[in-house]
Amino acid sequence: MRPFFVLALMIAVPQLASAADWRYCLAPSHAEHKIYLSPPFPATMSMDDAETQFARTLSKSGDHFDDVQCPRGDGQTAALTMQQHAITVNRELGNEVINLTWKPNG
């Protein structure tokens, strides 16, 4: 019985840890000196899927961007802190920060 418990615990713990993960997405437009940011959201999908959805939303809106990143934090507070740092750095660099109300589907 003990080996089964250990196996179940090994499977459950990473699942619990990932349930607390949060992301936000950002997409810089270097030529236009802009950066597009999403609000933080629970990381319920892969990074690739989140980046693809964010890029698709920007493209449909006609926004020009160079690439998309959706960094992960170990919780909502960590993601908010990372996002705020990105905002501060980009403002210091003279970039316009554009906060979007986007949320991923899924």
What is the predicted function of each stretch?
Residues 42-62:
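Compositionally biased P/S/T/G-rich terminal and signal peptide-adjacent segments
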Residues 73-106:
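Surface-exposed, polar helix/loop patches in the mature regions of secreted/periplasmic/lumenal proteins
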Residues 13-19:
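Sec/Tat signal peptide C-region and signal peptidase I cleavage site
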Residues 36-44, 63-78:
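A short, exposed loop/beta-hairpin motif centered on an aromatic-Gly-Thr core
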Residues 20-22, 26-47:
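Short Trp-Ser/Thr-centered turn/loop motifs at beta-strand boundaries
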Residues 4-13:
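Sec-dependent N-terminal signal peptides
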